[in-house]
């Protein structure tokens, strides 16, 4: 999860987020090299005493600054497209959970079970227990098995919302009348926090998301109790 004065991205707990972190570093290095080159050229132009005012064209330079940006864009586009296809790939999910956005809470339904559904509201600040996080804790966490592919079906009952969990690399819009889907897989147990990431009204900041990733045996025990 995030911590105060954090400069980087949250720690990855899913294969997709690990790929996104690598892509971020890859793109950042390209931007750094371009910025350094531009700064170096500007410094040379400001400090040199050499001038050539009669130059009308320079085809070699024009060729270089046409081909080089094209190569750079390809180096950025190829890994980006690879990750986009990975995020859209859904193969034999072990569990399906339907998520509905409301003003201003989330509701969840485990579609593989006959009657396993609940609403998830933010816990008010005055009701928090010691150690709990302000504006991030909920009364009903989404308990899911780790190291298994989970499909999330996401929609909305009223206005636009967005279901986002940064540590898992997830952000999917919840649109009224439309059912979007995404997959998640956590590689380690723990609590993972997210929030609605689409401005949806006056209490937009007060509809957090909490995923509790647990071993399969614990999940089976929890689901049996809930049903």
UniProtKB/Swiss-Prot annotation:
Residues holding Cu cation A2: 196, 198, 200, 204
Cofactor: Cu cation
Organism: Vulpes vulpes
Protein family membership: Belongs to the cytochrome c oxidase subunit 2 family.
One of the GO BP terms on file: ATP synthesis coupled electron transport
Compartment(s) where it occurs, according to its Swiss-Prot or TrEMBL record: Mitochondrion inner membrane
Entry note: cofactor: Binds a dinuclear copper A center per subunit.
Gene designation per UniProt: MT-CO2
Protein role: Component of the cytochrome c oxidase, the last enzyme in the mitochondrial electron transport chain which drives oxidative phosphorylation. The respiratory chain contains 3 multisubunit complexes succinate dehydrogenase (complex II, CII), ubiquinol-cytochrome c oxidoreductase (cytochrome b-c1 complex, complex III, CIII) and cytochrome c oxidase (complex IV, CIV), that cooperate to transfer electrons derived from NADH and succinate to molecular oxygen, creating an electrochemical gradient over the inner membrane that drives transmembrane transport and the ATP synthase.
PANTHER family: CYTOCHROME C OXIDASE SUBUNIT 2 (PTHR22888:SF9), CYTOCHROME C OXIDASE, SUBUNIT II (PTHR22888)
EC number: 7.1.1.9
Membrane topology: Multi-pass membrane protein
UniProt protein name: Cytochrome c oxidase subunit 2
GO cellular component, one term: mitochondrial inner membrane
